[in-house]
């Protein structure tokens, strides 16, 4: 399985209310409130975080139905935070909010939005961005993250860019990479009434594919 096939899984997915709800509930309560308040300074940040969580929940759901996906790294409220051990070797360490981060010599060297591994041992990382055209130095960031992951895992890795607005396919993508547009995916929360989200507790989706990122 390839990055293009992961992109196709997302593109062809049938979105459910449960996925949208779980995605919104991954956000801390203050950000959930900002999600439904267009006057909030944090509104756009909340939409971006929601979109990231939404893609993660879609990946879990689609992976469960696919024999080609062996694992999706847990993140956000599904992740298990462990304080950093300064004697540990370089690798993945979750942030307190469940972000997927890689530390080198004790410092955060990279953060990625998702990690997927296929049954034929292809490792894929992804970035989730509403509009990549506004993302600044995304090309150099992707190159640096790719180089780090290939060094840590000693294999070639593929990349998927997920965005919510139509853009030209970036020139920096390799032939093995892929891009997918989930149009207005950052607005899916609007399908839910705020009361379905604002004060609910997180409950992880049932998944046989979700794994701790440290064993991805």
Can you annotate each of these PLM segments?
Residues 1-216:
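Intrinsically disordered, low-complexity Ser/Thr/Pro/Gly-rich regulatory segments
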């Amino acid at each position: 399985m390839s990055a293009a096939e992961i992109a196709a899984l997302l593109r062809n997915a049938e979105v459910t209310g449960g996925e949208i709800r779980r995605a919104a509930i991954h956000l801390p309560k203050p950000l959930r409130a900002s999600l439904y308040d267009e006057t909030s300074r944090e509104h756009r940040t909340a939409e971006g975080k929601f979109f990231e969580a939404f893609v993660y929940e879609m990946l879990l759901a689609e992976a469960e139905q696919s024999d080609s996906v062996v694992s999706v790294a847990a993140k956000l409220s599904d992740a298990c935070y462990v304080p950093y051990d300064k004697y540990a070797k370089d690798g993945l360490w979750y942030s307190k909010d469940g972000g997927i981060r890689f530390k080198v010599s004790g410092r955060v060297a990279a953060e990625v939005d998702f990690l997927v591994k296929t049954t034929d041992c292809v490792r894929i990382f992804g970035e989730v961005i509403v509009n990549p055209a506004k993302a600044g130095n995304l090309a150099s960031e992707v190159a640096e993250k790719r180089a780090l992951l290939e060094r840590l895992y000693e294999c070639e890795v593929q990349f998927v860019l997920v965005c919510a607005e139509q853009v030209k396919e970036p020139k920096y993508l390799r032939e093995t990479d892929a891009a997918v547009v989930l149009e207005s995916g950052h607005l899916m929360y609007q399908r839910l009434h705020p009361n379905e989200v604002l004060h609910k507790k997180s409950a992880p989706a049932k998944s046989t594919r979700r794994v701790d990122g440290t064993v991805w």
